[in-house]
């Protein structure tokens, strides 16, 4: 009985970890692997936006989210 209980716990925990990984893939890992595609998409999305017009005074102006330090 103890082995069945441990297996059930491991399956539930493993399923939870898998679901978290599946949720983070399109949010974090896919943009990192397809950098150029996302840079082009952001250029299209931000075309025609003047940063100074939409940026609240006193805050840092947008920076490239794909830029490396």
UniProtKB/Swiss-Prot annotation:
Intervals, Mitochondrial matrix compartment? 1-8
Mitochondrial intermembrane topology: which positions?
A: 30-69
On induction, the UniProt comment says: By fatty acids, specifically palmitate, docosahexanoic acid and oleate.
Highest taxon, organism lineage: Eukaryota
Question: Where are its TM segments located?
Answer: 9-29
Keyword ATP-binding recorded? no
User: Which tissues does the record link to its expression?
Assistant: Highly expressed in the hypothalamus, the spinal cord, and sensory ganglia (at protein level). Also expressed on in the epidermis and dermis layers of the skin (at protein level). Expressed in preadipocytes and adipocytes (at protein level). Expressed in the ovary, specifically in granulosa cells of follicles that have passed the primary stage and in oocytes (at protein level).
Which residues are recorded as modified (Phenylalanine amide)? 66
Q: Which keywords does this Swiss-Prot/TrEMBL entry list?
A: Amidation, Membrane, Mitochondrion, Mitochondrion inner membrane, Secreted, Transmembrane, Transmembrane helix
* UniProt keyword annotation of Isomerase present: no
Q: Name one GO biological process term.
A: mitochondrial cytochrome c oxidase assembly
- GO annotation, cellular component aspect: extracellular region; mitochondrial inner membrane
Known InterPro entries for this protein? SMIM20
Subunit structure, interactors included:
Component of the MITRAC (mitochondrial translation regulation assembly intermediate of cytochrome c oxidase complex) complex, the core components of this complex being COA3/MITRAC12 and COX14. Interacts with COA3/MITRAC12 and COX4I1. Directly interacts with newly synthesized MT-CO1/COX1.
Name the record gives this protein: Small integral membrane protein 20
The gene that this protein is the product of is Smim20
